[in-house]
């Protein structure tokens, strides 16, 4: 298989309802993959499915900070097919302000989605990949995670963790 031939492969893309996640989904579809996009916003997912209009695209409403939702969706998917590829793209930016002004609930929400969500998806999907002796994971990060941003510390901290997760 050449590196851009994903026929007979299934990709799950988090944060796939719009933007970069949807663009990634389109590229995988163009390369022959079956694609399942996850997002917390059902309206975005429906709009994405209408825009793409491809029988190999499906979607599920999933909050990546909720491990039981992820497990349910994975069990549903793996009862029909393997999950070969995971693109952890889900993320939110939140408000820009100095660290000491952040409300702890807002901070926690951002980190739960941007870091815990990535961990949750890896933790839940990797056993399926191991059992099938194939799997590829891409954790989408940000330059803000590398360089930091004094006024977006929750976002920067959450995104810094994605590449720090160990290679599987």
Locate each region found by the language model.
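Active-site loop immediately N-terminal to the catalytic Tyr-X3-Lys motif
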Residues: 100, 147-153
């Amino acid at each position: 298989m050449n590196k851009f031939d994903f026929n007979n492969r299934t990709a799950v893309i988090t944060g796939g309802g719009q933007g970069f996640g949807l663009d990634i989904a389109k590229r995988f579809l163009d390369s022959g993959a079956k694609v399942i996009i996850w997002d917390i916003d059902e309206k975005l997912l429906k709009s994405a499915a209408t825009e793409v209009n491809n029988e190999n695209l499906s979607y599920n409403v999933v909050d990546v900070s909720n491990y039981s939702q992820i497990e349910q969706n994975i069990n549903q998917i793996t009862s029909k097919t393997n999950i070969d590829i995971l693109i952890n793209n889900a993320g939110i930016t939140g408000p820009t302000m100095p660290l000491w002004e952040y409300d702890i609930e807002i901070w926690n929400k951002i980190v739960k989605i941007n870091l815990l969500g990535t961990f949750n998806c890896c933790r839940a999907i990797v056993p399926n990949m191991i059992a099938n002796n194939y799997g590829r994971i891409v954790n989408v990060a940000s330059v803000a995670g590398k360089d930091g941003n004094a006024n977006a510390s929750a976002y920067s901290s959450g995104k810094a963790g994605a590449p720090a997760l160990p290679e599987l």
